[in-house]
Amino acid sequence: MARFTLPRDLYHGKGALEALKSFTGKKAMICVGGGSMKRFGFLDRAVGYLKEAGMEVELFEGIEPDPSVETVMRGAEAMLKFEPDWIIAMGGGSPIDAAKAMWIKYEYPEITFEEMCKVFGIPPLRRKAHFCAISSTSGTATEVTAFSIITDYQKGIKYPIADFEITPDVAIVDPDLAETMPKKLVAHTGMDAMTHAIEAYVSTAHCDYTDPLAIFAIRMIQGDLVDSYNGDMSKRDSMHNAQCLAGMAFSNALLGIVHSMAHKTGAAFADYGAHIIHGAANAMYLPKVIAFNAKDPEAKKRYGVIADEMKLGGSNDDEKVKLLIEYLRGMNDALNIPHCIQHYGPDSYPAEQGFVPEEVFLERLPEIAKNAIADACTGSNPRQPSQEELEKLLKCCYYDTEVDF
């Protein structure tokens, strides 16, 4: 038996933020990030709508990119003090992911972070509060998913929390918010969405309910992302819907080792002054993982279907896989995303010499590969890698070399 879970309500289209006026409750806590929602006036509007609905409102501000365990614990403490019956998470993937984890801790104060990370092991929520997610970026789709990513900076590891319990009750997908994204964020979140859709389509957990969502999202992203990056606001609006469809697909079909490796490399070199931004990591690793997974006959066939839907040509599946890989690498070029870790600069742009030294990468490689194999996303990958294979694959992602194994 399989399960397909989405938010009960999804409000979409320009002006959808006004849906907050219709909420019923006594207290709402709004969780936000670094200030863009306040700067562009969306936070004040959200507060006004909730007060119009008769609620007392409190803010938890300053959630950092790649939110930490410590931030989650501070937010949960604030919730325990304020006792909201609505948690409103607003912004990009980071504040929404953090708020999901805070929600768990608010409902179960004794739960540990390690217990939260047990895959599909969260006890029933909604005893104290319901959850609304309002996305301002077009990539993570955490507003409709059963996932949250939290970083343990002491270990340098990003941990996925995965459980249908943390699927939001309400999602608000208002493209007005996405129109404020800076160009680099458009690129990274957009390739995150493309990775979600492609991994969902080839996942071992894909089904008749997820396949149409994944394929349609791929086609939309192909048509919209580069133009959105170059300033076409109608395409920016369309991308906001495309990434949400990709999220619906992967939340139910799950993901694969592109995400496993992105999770485990993202903060692994933070002591060298930067992170490998999640969407950029996905963009770099996706072509390599396609080449690796395509050694599996069923996966190769499904990549061929993706290439057909994208109208890339090719007379057989081997040719189609090659054309798909070439197309995705071309998208990275168009979006100014590097092809490998070796040329990933501290500002995330292509650099002659990246910020991760070769000797440091090789020294940490076995541990990174071990952690990636244990990641929650690995189990649904169409080809299960050994420790040796994943180390070789990560080397290909570092040096941009051919995957021939």
PLM features: what roles do these ranges have?
Residues M1-W86, I341:
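ATP/NTP phosphate-donor binding region
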Residues A200-Y327:
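Active-site segments that bind and position negatively charged phosphate/pyrophosphate groups
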Residues P84-K100, S136-T142, H275-I276:
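Glycine/serine-rich anion-binding loops at beta->alpha junctions
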Residues E107-H206, K301-V305:
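A glycine/threonine-rich phosphate-anchoring loop and its flanking beta-alpha core
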Residues G34-G35, T137, V289:
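Residue-level signal for short, function-critical loop segments
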Residues R74-A76, P95-P109, V144-T145:
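Short Gly/Thr/Asp-enriched flexible loops that form oxyanion-binding sites at enzyme active sites
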Residues A307-F405:
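C-terminal charged capping/lid subdomain of soluble metabolic enzymes
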